Amino acid sequence: MSRPNPKAVDPNQELKERVRAFWQEHPCGTKFSDAEMGTREFFDRVEAHRYGKEWHIPLAADFSSTRGLKVLEIGCGLGTDGAQFAKAGADYTGIDLTEASIELARKRFELAGLKGEFRVSDAENLDFADETFDVVYSHGVLHHTPDTAKAVREIHRILKPGGRAMVMLYHRGSYNYRIGIRVLRRAGAGLLKSEGGIKIVHRLTGEPIDSLREHAQLAQANGGSSTDDFLSQSTDGAGNPLARVYSRREARDLFRDFRKVELRAYFLNKRFIPLIGSLLPRSIESALAARWGWHLWIYATK
């Protein structure tokens, strides 16, 4: 498979630019730390939040298995997972669509004394030669790019024969999508028309007041949200221009060029499980997530 022509006209360029602008302004994970951005304390709090809430990630990613391997992370964000690969002894490269995330990821590695290479790059047009990497990892990123199928083809191209991809996409069959977003958030959207309603939704869901007010302002300015817009803004915040969900069948189809594909689901958004969500032990949470988890992990071997 040949490398894409970087000079070719991209029909999704306008949408991709809006995606880039959103994440440039809101680097993923920054809202989970109130420490000064770019400090050691800032990164420590981001990491504690990530692996406290999404405690399955170290298990699912199996960072230690990448020792001595060339690893590419597509959408490295703040470098939180990237740091785990580097600590495990991987030859790590992280790319992101935004300069803001790359700058923060570099700072995180610098503070921790870790080695890694970083560059701004587009998942749909990777600037790497064929068969460069042993592992390609991407957590919660490719459902935000306009042509996800093209990005997956790029992963296949740059992987060595026998190389493996680990990709997380939002799961269409999840409780979070079918109930949390399509039912509970839709019902709650009507309450956002008043300050009292905003406070009710805040108490019921734990969603920050400022975030709910931003959702309300956007809905009022746009005259409501289409189904696609509502999904996008219900996943990663008000103003998020693009997010998609995938069924297991759709995920398998995306990775059809790979020799072997395995799917696993993780992570229940327990805020949307009334009364008992916060009380669930991890054993039950894991069992439920295996069927209805929000994060659909695709393990694909070239």
Per-region residue spans from a language model:
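N-terminal, positively charged/glycine-rich alpha-helical extensions of SAM-dependent methyltransferases
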Residues: 1-48
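Conserved alpha-helix/loop element of class I SAM-dependent methyltransferases that forms part
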Residues: 37-69
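Class I SAM-dependent methyltransferase SAM/SAH-binding core
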Residues: 66-125
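A short acidic, Gly/Pro-enriched loop at the edge of an enzyme's catalytic core
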Residues: 124-135
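A short glycine-rich, Lys/Arg-flanked "PGG" loop and its adjoining helix->strand segment in the class I
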Residues: 149-161
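Conserved class I S-adenosyl-L-methionine
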Residues: 164-220
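Short alpha-helix
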Residues: 240-265
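Core SAM-dependent methyltransferase catalytic element
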Residues: 259, 281-302
